[in-house]
Amino acid sequence: VHGVKDLNLTIHEGEIAAVVGSSGSGKSLLAHAVMGILPYNAFMDGTIRYDGEILDKKRLKALRGHELVLVPQSVSYLDPLMKVGKQVTKGSRKLETVLKMRQVFSRYGLEPGTEEKYPFELSGGMTRRILISTAVMERPRLVLADEPTPGLHMEAARRVMGHFRELADEGAGVLLITHDLELARETADKITVLYGGRTIEEAAAEDFYHEERLSHPYARALCRSMPENWTPDGERLCDTGDILTQMREEFGR
């Protein structure tokens, strides 16, 4: 089974590149492939380059967690039995590291004393900000954000997305993996749409406000599904057509 196939994606410094698709489209596999954390029985073919050089296992090991960081999808990445401050500092008691953590917490609106809390004492939004804080402690150059907003209401989700925009504006490249096209087009510079593990559309985020600029019927249907295309009564303002039939004919699923 090919989880992701024929994917070609470039992320520049200061840019947010969003990858959008439904569950099972291969989005998270992409992030795990870049970070070298695929399941033991997975096979990867192709080339990943970082700063123009091939990102082999040795180089990835040196960069991972420093220049290359992952903001994971699941909050289960946090140890439920360890205070979050210790997790963010990776157990370091150095004053410089602790002060850096507090500075990062302040930046993301985490109140003093948060470092002494356990994950179960935090709200969903706070937990997401802890995960981001853990990632940015090393001032990364490439941030992979894997579904960073599940379970958050729109206001909280937009705040989280704003943090990634800040990182990009400071020079980092951000790979944003999400199923939420509305958030992606508000935040990203460009968007790639995956379906069945394949790229079916690549366009500037602005183009996803204008259906006529998109070439693939599935991408156009996503554009038409956005809130501005629905009435207050929950009725579509336009027809999406028989998209499922078209996709099954194209992808055999």
Task: List where the protein language model places each region.
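Short catalytic/signature loops enriched in Gly
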Residues: 205-253
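Conserved ABC ATPase signature
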Residues: 118-122, 126
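A short, surface-exposed alpha-helical micro-motif characterized by mixed small hydrophobic
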Residues: 184-186
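ABC ATPase NBD coupling module
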Residues: 54-69, 208-212
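Q-loop/switch helix immediately C-terminal to the Walker
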Residues: 74, 80-93
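A short, proline-enriched helix->beta-strand linker immediately N-terminal to the Walker B motif
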Residues: 137-141
